[in-house]
Amino acid sequence: MASVAVENNVVNHIAEEIIRPVADFSPSLWGDRFLSFSIDNQVETKYAQEIEPLKEQTRSMLLASGRKLSETLNLIDVIERLGIAYHFEKEIDEILDRIYNENSNFEGDVYNEDLCTCRLQFRLLRQHGYNISLKIFSKFLDGNGRLKESLASDVLGLLSLYEASHVRSHGEDILEDALAFSTTHLESATPHLEYPLKEQVRHALEQSLHKGIPRIEIQFFISSVYDKQAIKNDVLLRFAKLDYNMLQMLHKQELAEVSRWWKDLNFVNTLPYARDRVVECYFWALGVYYEPQYSQARVMLVKTIAMISIVDDTYDAYGTVDELAIYTDVIQRWDIKEIDSLPDYMKISYKALLDLYKDYEKEMSRDGRSHVVYYAKERLKELVKSYNIEAKWFIEGHMPPASEYLRNAFVTTTYYYLATTSYLGMKYAKEQQFEWLSKNPKILEGCVTICRVIDDIATYEVEKNRGQLSTGIECYMRDYSVSTKEAMAKFQEMGESGWKDINEGMLRPTPIPMEFLSRILNLARLVDVTYKHNEDGYTHPEKVIKPHIIAMVVDSFKI
């Protein structure tokens, strides 16, 4: 829950004084900065004309024969890190499929690559869903099954090993050792490295590639690594910069559209108790998908996040127990005729919520998919029920058992709801995908767990200082008679287990296409970035998210 300060408010013209836990949220950092933007058609046309031949040259590079395995893997890795792989998904999948099938167990003399290539191959294949064998590590182990100390001097190999260790699944102890081994030796080596490798290693230790938000990692790699390297492919670099700027224009246009929608709703004035974070909501949606084909999905998701943030703050930072009970019931009924039973301030968000979903149904009807909006509505109804339980615990000072807390708090992460909503605007999302998601598959549970425990760790001190009893850490400490440090260690362990669930859930054969699984992975990545160093980057964006937003939707590459 948000940090709150109790103050008196008179609402609905009722004479009696109502004590409300009103949150003291900071105003938006952005004002009307993103309210107006229109794409320069001449610039767009110029970029598109230059990109086309660069794209064909890149495709020719991918399809060229006679390359060494290491050269092929490095080319794919660079293309992915530069953010242009979405142009070549079919080609990359075919290449990796061939590499995997040629020697899936990595046994015998056919396999004799260096540390860097081995780890890169392992990571790329795992990230594309191939359950590559751990035998690929065998030649780098000593007689005790530990990584050879002689590897400690190979910085590029260590960096590749470090990145590969983050795609580990349950029971892969060798990768646990690899993470510790590579981290220790990279930290020791960093002060002695030359730029840009030094910056690349420093960044990786701060934010692993696998757990990073793709668009942020792309911007960093182009500007701080590849552009600074002595040896680079100028075609790929030029292509990447043009493509980044081209996409950024689309992103700015979307953000302007959403900002105008938000300003027209006027929640800043009519519901001043709530957070004004529409730009941060767009950052969140951009983290889930940045590619151009997901423009509709992005706009729908950012509106959903912004709206649920208002609902969250209504439960978290303003409503009374009685009001929230009515609000919860009315949302279950989902009928505009019920609006008169609500206090005046709740009518505003309730009507906006119903209007938003009416717009979704109209938009989805063009593709004959309006019926799948039902799944998002059901998740929303589930969410507000849990919000209501959480609010009642807080207001009444109740501390539930840890198991009961977690069961409810998994829902209030909003991630069951947001994962479902993220599929709405995806053109190929059919009822099958929504049905699968509605059953809370293990990969989704892993994502939700990560969000819950990392949030609880990050906000523990703030919530403790305001006397909140029903926090996950406090509940766990009481139930298991452990210290704060031990409880946090357990929650951290749960988060790591959640990542392993996600990594396993991405492996083939998958129940639904990778396109949909990637949304769940990206939601988990958003948590890793937004709560970095135990900061609540959404509520207090100036410390964590602001630099990323500027990099993603303000700063462009010089062409």
UniProtKB/Swiss-Prot annotation:
Tissue specificity: Expressed only in treated leaves an not detected in control leaves.
Cofactor entry: Mg(2+)
A GO MF term: magnesium ion binding
Induction annotation: Up-regulated by UV treatment.
Cellular component terms per the entry's GO annotation: cytoplasm
Record note on cofactor: Binds 3 Mg(2+) ions per subunit.
EC number: 4.2.3.61
Tagged with keyword Lyase: yes
Family affiliation: Belongs to the terpene synthase family.
SUBUNIT field: Monomer.
Protein name: 5-epiaristolochene synthase
Organism of this sequence: Capsicum annuum
Taxon lineage: Eukaryota, Viridiplantae, Streptophyta, Embryophyta, Tracheophyta
Gene for this chain: EAS
